[in-house]
Amino acid sequence: MAETDSKAPAKAKPAALRKGALVKVNRSAYNDSLEAAASDPTAPDYIFEGPGELLLVKGDYGQVRWNRPVPDVWLRMDQLESCG
């Protein structure tokens, strides 16, 4: 069999966030999401300013703990960005 060079060009992918990473929420990705619709009409500023610690990653979602006396939250990974 002859080998063919039909490889698709690799897309540049941002660095994946891992457990323990310091993150904040991307405001534009969050505002029109299902998570925003299910929450208070105005999200607290601290989630957009960060940092929050990424505790766990399961599939497309990450669990974030803020350095405040508030519950941990699950958000889609595409709504999170690195704080560093």
Curated annotation (Swiss-Prot):
It is found in: Cellular thylakoid membrane. GO terms for cellular component: plasma membrane-derived thylakoid membrane. The keyword NAD applies. One of its GO terms (molecular function) is oxidoreductase activity, acting on NAD(P)H, quinone or similar compound as acceptor. It catalyses: a plastoquinone + NADH + (n+1) H(+)(in) = a plastoquinol + NAD(+) + n H(+)(out); a plastoquinone + NADPH + (n+1) H(+)(in) = a plastoquinol + NADP(+) + n H(+)(out). It is an enzyme of class 7 (translocase). Pfam families: NdhO (PF11910). It is a peripheral membrane protein. Keywords: Membrane, NAD, NADP, Plastoquinone, Quinone, Thylakoid, Translocase, Transport. It comes from the Bacteria. Its EC number is 7.1.1.-. The keyword NADP applies. NDH-1 can be composed of about 15 different subunits; different subcomplexes with different compositions have been identified which probably have different functions. NDH-1 shuttles electrons from an unknown electron donor, via FMN and iron-sulfur (Fe-S) centers, to quinones in the respiratory and/or the photosynthetic chain. The immediate electron acceptor for the enzyme in this species is believed to be plastoquinone. Couples the redox reaction to proton translocation, and thus conserves the redox energy in a proton gradient. Cyanobacterial NDH-1 also plays a role in inorganic carbon-concentration. Belongs to the complex I NdhO subunit family. This is NAD(P)H-quinone oxidoreductase subunit O. It comes from Parasynechococcus marenigrum (strain WH8102). The lineage of its organism: Bacteria, Bacillati, Cyanobacteriota, Cyanophyceae, Synechococcales.
